[in-house]
């Protein structure tokens, strides 16, 4: 068994140092190329989307997700970089998006391969690289099926003041709308103002009972201690404020929704 382990792995007719037989030509190393190929410039890519993840493994880990570089098509490992929007290629040093652009933004790639980010509504953008400084015309933004801006959703509302129609989209539990025509505030529906009016009336009733009890209980002492009158005034002011607020909500104009809009 030991003799078998010491036996040479190559045949006797080959040189032990070079692994070549006597009749083979001597090995000549391949000369290193003088210049590497320059990556070609690409036309501007408007609204560039991130490439899909490749099921192949990266050189560092056989299970790490990778994507293809949008410039040189090299594989880029995104392990530990999922939270980023773009990653940098280690071959061409250019950025490649791995996530969609933030809301209201889009990716644009300059012909010099620089990845830019701008507003969706932008029509012109300049490359920041000192040797490029190219101005890219993106053209007018036409809303269509592929537009990242969603169409407005909401309801058409008839103003309770001027009876004109306007679009309102912010529907919450406290829905107050300002008409763009008459600039007056009204409530969308009757539920919210009725609820507020009822609360203010109940507070007003509580303050009325409290004020009446305070005045009746301190009537004689107030003639001796003048500071008690200040507490009377305070509670009377609370009664008036809650009463005014209750009347305000009770008399608020109501704007009725006409139909849903999408």
Curated annotation (Swiss-Prot):
It catalyses: a 1,2-diacyl-sn-glycero-3-phospho-(1D-myo-inositol-4,5-bisphosphate) + H2O = a 1,2-diacyl-sn-glycero-3-phospho-(1D-myo-inositol-5-phosphate) + phosphate. Pfam families: Tmemb_55A (PF09788). The active site is at 118. InterPro entries: PtdIns-P2-Ptase. Keywords: Endosome, Hydrolase, Lysosome, Membrane, Transmembrane, Transmembrane helix. GO terms for molecular function: phosphatidylinositol-4,5-bisphosphate 4-phosphatase activity. It is found in: Late endosome membrane; Lysosome membrane. Its EC number is 3.1.3.78. It is a multi-pass membrane protein. A motif (CX5R motif) lies at residues 118-124. One of its GO terms (cellular component) is phagocytic vesicle membrane. Residues 1-25 are annotated as: Disordered. The chain crosses the membrane at residues 198-218, 227-247. Its main location: membrane. It comes from the Eukaryota. GO terms for biological process: phosphatidylinositol dephosphorylation. Catalyzes the hydrolysis of the 4-position phosphate of phosphatidylinositol 4,5-bisphosphate. This is Type I phosphatidylinositol 4,5-bisphosphate 4-phosphatase-B. It comes from Danio rerio (Zebrafish). The gene is tmem55bb.
